């Protein structure tokens, strides 16, 4: 499921750096253009007139402009001048043409990027792929969808709009010849005709699955996944009967019909997006990407499992059925990776696993890695304001609040006062400074180093005031299903297996040698009191977990509703585990998961009309950020309406699914409050949590988040920097080498002056280039576009 929007590309890089010996992902550039760039001169003039006109004439001019745009015939064009900037001589003649870096974005390599004929090693500009913003010009989008687009006289065709792009009104174009040469790879042998002959597909899902080729990924050297040693098996589902808070929806009327706590039979897709591999295949758990293939795979020795005499009274059998019902012997076929049907998104459109493998080989495809699990936890993690705002305000007394902030305050104090901490911060991400500080510790009093320290403190302080608090012995990790239970179902045929992890327990090897008994399980987005208090496995169960689960993934039970409470899949979703006593003690009592029946995605034939409807409808119904902020404003008010936030949480999740379902419930009686809260100013702590202006925020309230914001400021705002001592200044003369006397009138000195002059000229050229790169980075949005 979709989580909070994060910079996935930066995480992508960090996680590959952490796994030793792997090739790093390469960065590339592409153009990101807009439908406005396709305007004719007449359309542009009408648009300018529309923007400048008064309110009375505005509707008339809008209709004239829109009618003119809709009547365009032929293929729209974006000429070369939209892609480049120009310098002219005094006579108006072009003397220099340069790429317009303001129109470019930076991405990391992906499956599609590797299909291009470009060298990806040099931060290349890739012209085979272009991103476009619809900018609410839906008529132009339809024209491009039906007819393509000419960019610098090259024809481009619509490729897809990923889930993220659909919400933002964007889509992907590819150069026509590039598409024709690679369409079998993009679709791994499928065509729209094949899909339609087999009943069609939900348009939103179809677009998202096509977009998998654009997900950031690498094929790691030395870790090729052999498709012939892989197998696709059915999904493993169980049903759990537990108490839930039901939000009833009348799907025909699209209305909320009631709410109440009761016991329900809840279906749990235990392996939703997850598979497993023998521990020798990859160095750690990983998210995978390939055409139509997406999810996470986790290490588990299923051969060792098969070697047991019996499990729950049954001898494991290596002969199993794949997703199509065909028989396989896992041992004889040397199977090393087992995928589940939920990972191969279009599996029903292939006739068999052999059919998929045939297309895979014919198109010379590879299973790539999107991200490896973190194998070196830092030993601490930071909270989100969402985790804090849902704690009980009555339980979070001033004393408890001080306890919660203590580690963060200590860290901020160390930045200001402790020399070793200062040096560590000053040298972080800069090896040259680190080496210099090792030789001359006094460098910490240099003005440049001090400016870095002051900036670092302000950033960390602002983060803390935005409720990003340090939690010791806490970590983010992948969520892993109980693979022992899965193997018991798969190889022993037991429908509701016991597994290893008991009801209301979790396991993570990070806590094997730590004294904690209980953790809070948290995940973003965290909107309605989604605190999953769980016990850590101990004693005999712990020893069995050590035997079967070796990585730092959090293994969850197959017997409880943690997945419903936190709304996670196991396709690479991450969880925060914290044993923080204050948080656990301040969690509200008697939490039960919210439960509702969502709208079902509807299949249709794949055609341009269906694609147009899916993209435009999603663009016009995106309000996820608004819903989250409305809920935060509700928590920030003294009279928090918890029923309203339950409804908003459900509404938010239905909105997340909108690209697939194309359906949403009406707010009804909750709409008035929704609009009122939407119009309210932001809470004070949003100045630091989201960079909002003071003028757009309220005064400090008594909410959890605002109280922490105020407390952090009072505890750290008045302390002086320990390194801002007028008597402690860095003397650069200690860097001088006095062994060799210098004669400024000597011939050698004049030669050195000439060398220095040449170097200064080179420095100016380099500085200019660096400014261009910085300018590009500042204007570039590094977006994962991971479906």
Pin down the residues of each PLM region.
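Duplex nucleic acid-engaging cores and interfaces of nucleic-acid transaction enzymes
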Residues: 574
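Catalytic core segments in nucleotide and nucleic-acid processing enzymes
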Residues: 594-596
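Conserved small-residue
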Residues: 1-564, 583-585, 599, 604-787
């Amino acid at each position: 499921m979709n989580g909070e929007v994060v910079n996935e590309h930066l995480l992508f890089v960090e996680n590959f750096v952490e796994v030793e010996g792997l090739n790093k992902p390469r960065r590339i550039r592409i153009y990101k253009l807009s439908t406005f760039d396709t305007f004719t001169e007449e359309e542009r003039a009408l648009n300018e007139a529309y923007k400048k006109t008064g309110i009375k004439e505005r509707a008339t001019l809008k209709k004239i402009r829109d009618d003119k745009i809709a009547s365009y015939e032929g293929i729209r064009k974006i000429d070369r001048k939209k892609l480049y900037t120009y310098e002219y001589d005094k006579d108006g003649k072009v003397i220099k043409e340069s790429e317009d870096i303001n129109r470019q974005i930076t991405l990391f390599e992906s499956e599609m990027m590797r299909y291009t004929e470009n060298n990806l090693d040099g931060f290349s500009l890739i012209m085979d792929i272009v991103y476009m913003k619809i900018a609410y010009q839906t008529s132009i989008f339809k024209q491009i969808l039906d007819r393509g687009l000419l960019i610098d006289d090259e024809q481009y065709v619509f490729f897809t709009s990923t889930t993220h792009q659909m919400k933002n009104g964007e889509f992907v174009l590819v150069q026509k010849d590039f598409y024709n040469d690679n369409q079998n790879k993009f679709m791994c042998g499928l065509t729209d005709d094949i899909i339609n002959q087999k009943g069609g597909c939900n348009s939103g899902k179809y677009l998202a699955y096509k977009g998998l080729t654009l997900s950031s990924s690498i094929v790691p050297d030395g870790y090729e996944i052999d498709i012939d040693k892989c197998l696709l098996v059915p999904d493993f589902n169980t049903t759990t009967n537990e108490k839930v808070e039901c939000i009833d929806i009348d799907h025909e009327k699209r209305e909320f019909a009631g709410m109440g706590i009761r016991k329900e039979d809840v279906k749990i897709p235990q392996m939703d997006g997850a598979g497993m591999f023998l521990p020798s295949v990859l160095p750690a758990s990983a998210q995978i990407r390939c055409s139509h293939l997406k999810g996470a795979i986790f290490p588990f020795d299923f051969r060792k499992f098969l070697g047991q005499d019996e499990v729950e009274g049954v001898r494991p059998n290596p002969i199993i059925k794949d997703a199509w019902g065909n028989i396989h012997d896992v041992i004889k076929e040397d199977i090393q990776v087992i995928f589940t049907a939920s990972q191969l998104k279009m599996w029903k459109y292939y006739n068999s696993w052999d059919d998929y493998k045939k297309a895979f080989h014919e198109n010379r495809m590879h299973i790539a890695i999107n991200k490896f699990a973190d194998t070196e936890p830092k030993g601490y993690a930071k909270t989100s304001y969402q985790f804090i705002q849902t704690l009980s305000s009555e339980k979070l007394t001033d004393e408890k609040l001080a306890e919660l902030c203590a580690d963060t305050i200590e860290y901020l104090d160390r930045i200001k006062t402790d020399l070793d901490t200062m040096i560590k911060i000053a040298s972080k991400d800069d090896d040259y400074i680190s080496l210099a500080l090792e030789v001359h510790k006094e460098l910490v009093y240099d003005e440049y180093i001090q400016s870095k320290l002051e900036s670092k403190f302000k950033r960390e302080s602002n983060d803390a005031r935005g409720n990003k608090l340090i939690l010791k012995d806490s970590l983010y990790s992948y969520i892993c299903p109980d693979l022992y239970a899965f193997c018991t179902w798969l190889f022993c045929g037991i429908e509701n297996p016991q597994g290893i992890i008991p009801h209301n327990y979790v396991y993570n090897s990070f806590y094997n040698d730590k004294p904690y008994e209980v953790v809070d399980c948290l995940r973003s987005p965290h909107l309605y009191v989604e605190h999953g208090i769980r016990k850590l496995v101990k004693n005999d169960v712990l020893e069995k977990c050590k035997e079967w689960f070796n990585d730092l993934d959090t293994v969850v039970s197959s017997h409880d509703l943690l997945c419903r409470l936190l709304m996670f899949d196991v396709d690479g979703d991450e969880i925060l585990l914290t044993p923080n006593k204050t948080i656990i003690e301040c969690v509200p009592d008697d939490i039960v998961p919210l439960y509702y029946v969502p709208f079902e995605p509807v299949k249709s034939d794949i055609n341009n009309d269906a694609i147009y409807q899916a993209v435009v409808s999603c663009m016009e119904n995106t309000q996820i950020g608004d819903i989250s902020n409305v809920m935060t404003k509700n928590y920030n008010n003294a009279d928090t309406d918890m029923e309203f936030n339950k409804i908003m949480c459900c509404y938010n999740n239905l909105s997340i699914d909108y690209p697939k379902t194309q359906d949403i419930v009406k707010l009804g009686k909750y709409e008035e409050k929704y609009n009122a809260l939407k119009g309210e100013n932001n809470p004070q702590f949003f100045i630091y949590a989201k960079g909002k202006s003071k003028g757009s925020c309220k005064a400090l309230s008594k909410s959890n988040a605002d109280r922490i914001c105020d407390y952090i400021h009072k505890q750290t705002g008045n302390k002086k920097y320990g390194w801002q001592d007028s008597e402690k200044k860095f003397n650069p003369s200690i860097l001088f080498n006095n062994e060799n006397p210098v004669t400024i009138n000597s011939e050698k000195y004049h030669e050195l002056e000439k060398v220095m002059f040449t170097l200064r000229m080179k420095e100016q050229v380099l500085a200019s280039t660096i400014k261009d790169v910085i300018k590009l980075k500042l204007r570039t949005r590094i977006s994962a576009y991971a479906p």
